[in-house]
Design a protein with these regions (language model features):
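Terminal alpha-helical segments
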Residues: 1-120
């Protein structure tokens, strides 16, 4: 997928997530946020020449380099993506339960990633 394809797909999934309700759908929102992060993160990696269009990173922890070595313009987005990955582990894969802070954190991290994509 190209960076444009990733941005389009990430935006489509993000719009779908916004239709879900909290707290009822918090697991789907946290899990879906990782999918949005995957698309926006890969778009940024392609745009900044870190990965070719044929290469993809499923999650920040699967990158071949640390976030602090990525190009400066995309570091905040990848820090947000790493936080989404942690939230997914804590809430989807572990036994954490919903709390009101979760909703604002998920949306804030996704908005950080979207902003980086708009900035190019």
């Amino acid at each position: 997928m190209t960076s444009s394809d990733h941005i389009t797909e990430g935006g489509r999934i993000f719009a779908s997530l916004k239709k879900l309700a909290l707290p009822e759908d918090y697991l789907a929102i946290v899990d879906g946020a990782m999918i949005v992060g995957y698309h926006l993160g890969n778009a940024l990696l392609h745009i900044h020449g870190v990965l070719s269009d044929a290469e993809h990173a499923n999650r920040p922890s699967a990158l071949d380099q640390r976030i602090d070595t990525l190009p400066a313009p995309i570091r905040p987005a990848f820090e947000a993506f790493a936080e989404l990955e942690k939230l997914r582990f804590d809430y989807v894969r572990s036994a954490s339960t919903y709390n009101d802070r979760l909703a604002s954190v998920v949306w804030r991290h996704l908005e950080t990633m979207q902003h980086a994509c708009r900035a190019g």
